[in-house]
Regions:
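A conserved glycine-rich beta-strand in the N-terminal activation segment of trypsin-fold
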Residues: 40-58, 114-116, 212, 233
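Conserved H-D interstitial segment of serine endopeptidase catalytic domains
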Residues: 43, 61-64, 68-109, 179-181
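Chymotrypsin/trypsin-fold serine protease catalytic domain
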Residues: 98, 120, 125-126, 131-201, ...
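Disulfide-stabilized extracellular ectodomain repeats and their linkers
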Residues: 38-40, 64, 81, 135, ...
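Acidic glycine-/aspartate-rich tracts in secreted/extracellular proteins
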Residues: 21, 66-69, 87-92, 126-131, ...
Length: 255
């Protein structure tokens, strides 16, 4: 058993027991500018924000599977209980509210497997979003960024440990680790794990409500946020699902 605590971003689910602690305030998470993150959406269940996500076409969103999965398995909550807010940097207002018509959880996802493995779901929208300056799909990256690359992520998660969700979309930067360093630091072996570590002493990282947050490099979607380690703002690497490992699966549905 690993001496590392993995916390799902949607719920404070303790998967491995370790020392608990409260991380520092994530002051370097900055407010997103209007139109700067046109791919980012808020996934809402019964009208309440649960996760982030990214538009990958005008009627498909990608997010983390554990955001929609019942008990960590292949069955999802009813699609009609969800909608997405697209085209707004405000969690509670603006943009376009579009209900879901279908939820597709990755066929190899199971929360009983290694944390974050295959933790992806595709969400089909009932109607296409209206594309404009604030609402645009993002292209999928074709290869994993080199170690040390600086990626940005955007989400509505808490800006500090035990805080409430942010009203406005926030952005921050992290550096990617090599696959081998990522696996060693988190005691995990799955190939689709991508780790982002603090930039210098910048503790801006994932927190509750950030699951499904898109990680971007060179204007392309590289990964989807899956879990954080040791409490948000701990300064430990965050776990993402590398979407470049799942392009074939995504392209089966998204055209």
């Amino acid at each position: 058993m690993s001496p590392v605590q993995f916390l799902q971003l949607l719920l404070p689910l303790l998967l491995v027991v370790v020392t608990l602690g409260v991380g520092p305030t994530q002051a370097s998470r900055l407010p997103a500018e209007v139109g700067s993150q046109p791919h980012s959406v808020s996934l809402r269940r019964n009208g309440v924000h649960v996760c982030g996500g990214a538009l990958v076409s005008d009627n498909w969103v990608i997010t983390a599977a554990h955001c929609v999965s019942i008990s960590g398995g292949q069955q999802s909550y009813p699609a009609q209980s969800y909608n997405v807010r697209a085209g707004s940097i405000q969690r509670l207002a603006g943009g376009q509210l579009v209900p879901l018509s279908q939820i597709i959880i990755h066929q190899n996802y199971s929360s009983s497997e290694a944390a974050g493995a295959n933790d992806l779901a595709l969400l089909q929208l009932q109607t296409k979003v209206t594309l404009n300056a604030n609402t645009k799909p993002i292209d999928l990256a074709t290869e994993r960024p080199a170690a040390g690359s600086q990626l940005s992520f955007s989400g509505w998660g808490s800006s500090q440990a035990e805080g409430s969700f942010s009203h406005g979309l926030q952005v921050a930067s992290r550096q990617s680790l090599s696959a081998s360093d990522c696996q060693k630091q988190l005691f995990l072996e799955q190939e689709d794990l991508l780790c982002l570590s603090p930039v210098a002493e910048d503790y801006a990282g994932l927190c509750s409500g950030d699951a499904g947050a898109p990680a971007i490099y060179n204007g392309q979607l590289v990964a989807i946020a899956a879990f954080f380690v040791g409490g948000c703002g701990s300064g430990q690497p965050d776990g993402y699902v590398d979407v470049t490992q799942h392009r074939e699966w995504i392209n089966e549905y998204v055209n």
